[in-house]
């Protein structure tokens, strides 16, 4: 959909834009910022971001990116969760993971003016584990750049990565349940006798029963087949309220609703999951 603004906008003046969408469930409101600027080189910035993250997946092409990095060569970390402009070339180019693009991203302009721009991009990659099982990762990257007549300079770069939890790639050790690549702050809760564990991974809610080894995906916006960009749109979160001995779980879903009857809305939903009925 293309929107044409008939009002005259003052150059470099930021405006708020409200969009009203009439549906059979009522009116939905969306808000964004609008600014009129010249010579912002938006197309060049978007092209740079798309080229950068795709080159990172190809070791040969990724060599071209070393000129943009400010690598700390003393770093020996192999953690892919938190990468930045000071990370090593090996970390930027995914080390030994050898991933491929699973779902391409669309660069989004966060801020832009005549000299600098900030863009973000969200995409998915796929890689094989040691047993040959496919693992999916959600990737979010942030770029801050400056445009010059000779080249685009990379002022800041950040990448966060989290693995999408799947039953096919479950790994359990003496230390517990391994959730793969993600940050260490896990939303989880157990019942009183630790017979049922509920945890959140990349916007999905799971339960696990150690006694019988059963996993259940309680809530997810992802589709098993024929998924699309809504699968990896992570602008919601889940707060676990209660875990019962019988496996029932009460939880709160809040944020942007990717799918369902409330798709496109932001809000808060309270749910009860029945383990016996699996709903």
Model-derived regions, located:
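Surface-exposed, charged secondary-structure patches
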Residues: 1-16, 87-133, 237-245
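Short linear interaction motifs
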Residues: 99-102, 120-136, 166-187, 229-235
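Core segments of small alpha/beta cavity-forming domains
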Residues: 1, 14-97, 172-214, 220-223, ...
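A short, surface-exposed beta-strand/turn
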Residues: 131-156, 267-276
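Short, surface-exposed charged micro-motifs
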Residues: 108-109, 142-144, 187, 196-197
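Short, solvent-exposed aromatic-acidic interface loops
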Residues: 35, 156-166
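Beta-strand elements of well-folded, non-transmembrane domains
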Residues: 23, 123-127, 149
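Well-ordered beta-strand positions in beta-sheet-rich domains
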Residues: 2, 29-34, 106, 136-144
